[in-house]
Amino acid sequence: MLDNEQLEQIQKKLQKNITSKRYCHTIGVMHTSISMAMRYGADLQQAALAGLLHDCAKCLDDKEMLRQCDKYDIPCNKTEKKQPYLLHAKLGACYAAQKYGVEEDAVCSAIRYHTTGRPGMSLLEAIVFTADYIEPNRDMDCKPYPLERIRRTAFFDLNQATGMILKNTLTYLEE
């Protein structure tokens, strides 16, 4: 069980390791994750921790990302080796456990899948996946579903919101 002081210590440590812009985004994801956890009945502490640490490995350059994956025996496919920035979620889940002391598998899994999602996502995974996309500091032109529509949908139908995000992501990748 995480208390407020422990969460504050993790925040301070994280703030030293990521850019101020990334930290602002991270705090937005943490608060959005907590709000969604309240709405859907998920564990608030797990939502806070997963939201806070979801991008804890994001600020590494490509070479360092690959080196760290090798160090922690994180498997990388061909696409990830060509585009190492895709590894930040896998490495972030590892960092959450190794560097930030996260013991809950559910939290590490939510971090692991916050970018790609996966079939059969747990409630916490779906919350962090969605919170990363809709947090208040995000400002992006989304197709076919506008960001504001996804934000509204996320608080009354989480499954529909995750589907909308996945559709937007596929549309973006196809363009």
Report each predicted region and the residues it spans:
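Divalent metal-dependent catalytic cores for phosphoryl transfer on phosphate-bearing substrates
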Residues: 12-16, 39-163
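Charged phosphate-binding loop/patch that engages nucleotide di/tri-phosphates or the phosphate backbone
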Residues: 171-175
